[in-house]
């Protein structure tokens, strides 16, 4: 089964960008080529700065490629949470920001006549098991002035009490972004290896960038020396399937813990859910989604399936603004918590305003320097959980060897007296590399759903061969394939039906 999203499969106008070689100086540098980084670069260039964007792999290949692409202020249960922790004023401010973000995306699509499947839909949010929670959501949204209605709705999960918001939007995110004119330079396959926060120099594999303004938009912030983001963010993975031939005329979101998200696309519907902390949980998400889709839409073919990762803050608000106290002209965008479309547009304007010294109504709302109770308690729990993963991983020493690894699977094993991660190809070929994440040395975990190695502490991910996929790690795992002995190589080979090798 393919693991490309429906957006990637239908992204036919893919343009290649060069790798940065050499040293350059610019007015603004954006690190990270997702929707947040791209829109931030767009706004910084719009304000007259010579702007460069660098992406470690391919433009829009990360979280943006795996989004369900809903442009909406109707974001699950966020408003009651904000109202409880910070009061209605903050909840209303967040609602206003999302309306502005929606308007920004719509204006850009109209201004540049972008054909990206932009479509207005109704959005239904509900708890299929707790109507009181649905009523509470409606009450909060009414109190803050959100345009919603409490209705009995026919959803894919059946007839439920739901909060309906009209005039929300869905679109093809990659077509939108690729059609948005880039008045800035783009470099792909250009991974930031270090950030000198004093001299504002970012070093890459084959060059460096000196910038007056630096924006870190890498999903997970990569400057560990400031901001304590490894404690303030939880890496979360979600799973989605595309069901061919199924239909839905709105978007649907069940806010119970294991609830699902459904939205139409050109050719069927996407069904998403089974969110979990990266590197943890059982590995039956896609099977669960297929079973749920069959229950809702009958037996229909699944076109593709994919996973996406995002960072979640502990009060539900993104971190957008100054990276840390004492750092001048260095900014961060992170923590969208799976709601990155409208938030990216808001973040782009906020960063451009801060860089140019303009006031922005949402600076305090999204400030990475905020120290509120919703942040503190979640941060404390995250510190203990991350410490537990670090300690347990370093105390664990496997007894099994490479012989125990099944074809097409990975496992942490004992190899030449050391703990190594080993992957076995379907033909029996073995690959071995360091089992500890190069970021903070937590033990990696094999994800059989995506055929990747994931870090449960901070969400670094590596492909089956140990090559880096996503930050905060900045390098791939060290290879140890040369340590695989002849006996283990022989055990790894598939035997033919006649018993020969």
Question: Model segments located where?
Answer:
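Active-site substrate-recognition segment that forms the wall
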Residues: 111-119, 208-209, 214-328, 343
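Dinucleotide-binding Rossmann-like beta1-alpha1 core, especially the glycine-rich loop
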Residues: 74-152
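N-terminal Rossmann-like FAD-binding beta1-loop-alpha1 element of flavoenzymes
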Residues: 24-53
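Rieske [2Fe-2S] iron-sulfur-binding domain
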Residues: 241, 412-497
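C-terminal catalytic lobe of FAD-dependent flavoproteins
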Residues: 256-257, 266, 286-287, 299-379, ...
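Extreme N-terminal leader/targeting segments of oxidoreductases
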Residues: 1-28, 477-480, 493-497
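Glycine-rich FAD pyrophosphate-binding loop
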Residues: 46-66
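Helical element adjacent to the flavin cofactor pocket in flavoenzyme catalytic cores
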Residues: 138-140, 162-212, 217
């Amino acid at each position: 089964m393919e693991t490309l999203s429906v957006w990637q499969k239908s992204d036919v106008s893919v343009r290649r960008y060069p790798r940065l070689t050499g040293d350059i100086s610019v007015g603004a540098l954006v690190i990270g080529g997702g929707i947040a980084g791209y829109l931030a670069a767009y706004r910084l260039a719009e304000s007259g700065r010579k702007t460069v964007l660098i992406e470690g792999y391919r433009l829009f290949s990360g979280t943006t490629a795996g989004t369900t692409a809903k442009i909406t202020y109707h974001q699950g249960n966020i408003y009651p949470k904000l109202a409880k922790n910070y009061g209605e004023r903050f909840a209303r401010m967040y609602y206003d920001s999302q309306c502005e973000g929606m308007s920004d995306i719509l204006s850009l699509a109209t201004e540049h006549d972008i054909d990206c499947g932009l479509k207005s839909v109704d959005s239904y949010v509900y708890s299929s098991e707790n109507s009181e929670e649905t009523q509470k959501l409606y009450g909060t949204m009414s109190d803050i002035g959100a345009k919603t209605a409490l209705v009995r709705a026919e959803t894919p999960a059946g007839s439920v009490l739901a909060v309906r918001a009209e005039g929300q939007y869905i679109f093809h995110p990659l077509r939108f972004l690729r059609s948005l004119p880039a008045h800035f330079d783009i470099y792909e396959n250009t991974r930031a290896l270090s950030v000198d926060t004093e001299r504002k120099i970012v070093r890459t594999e084959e060059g460096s960038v000196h910038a007056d303004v630096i924006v870190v938009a890498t999903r997970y912030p990569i400057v560990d020396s400031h901001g304590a983001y490894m404690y303030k963010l939880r890496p979360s993975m979600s799973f989605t399937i595309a069901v061919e031939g199924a239909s839905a005329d709105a978007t649907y979101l069940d806010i119970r813990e294991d609830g699902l998200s459904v939205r139409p696309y050109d050719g069927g519907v996407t069904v998403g859910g089974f969110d979990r902390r990266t590197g943890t949980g059982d590995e039956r998400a896609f099977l669960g989604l297929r079973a749920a889709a069959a229950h809702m839409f009958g037996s229909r073919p699944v076109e593709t399936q994919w996973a996406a990762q995002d960072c979640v803050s502990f009060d539900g608000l993104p971190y957008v603004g100054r990276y840390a106290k004492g750092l001048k002209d260095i900014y961060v965008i992170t923590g969208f918590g799976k709601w990155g479309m409208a938030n990216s547009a808001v973040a782009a304007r906020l960063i451009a305003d801060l860089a140019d010294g303009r006031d922005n109504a949402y600076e305090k709302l999204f400030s990475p320097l905020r120290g509120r109770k919703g942040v503190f308690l979640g941060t404390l729990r995250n510190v203990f959980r991350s410490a537990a993963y670090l300690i347990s991983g370093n105390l664990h020493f496997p007894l099994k060897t490479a012989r125990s690894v099944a074809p097409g699977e990975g496992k942490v094993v004992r190899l030449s007296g050391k703990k190594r991660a080993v992957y076995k190809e379907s033909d029996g070929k073995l690959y071995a590399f360091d089992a500890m994440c190069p970021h903070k040395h937590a033990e990696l975990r094999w994800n059989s759903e995506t055929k990747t190695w994931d870090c449960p502490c901070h969400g670094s991910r590596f492909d089956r061969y140990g090559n880096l996929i996503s930050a905060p790690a900045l390098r791939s795992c060290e290879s140890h394939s040369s340590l695989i002995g002849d006996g283990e190589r022989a055990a790894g080979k598939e035997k033919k039906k006649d018993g020969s090798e």
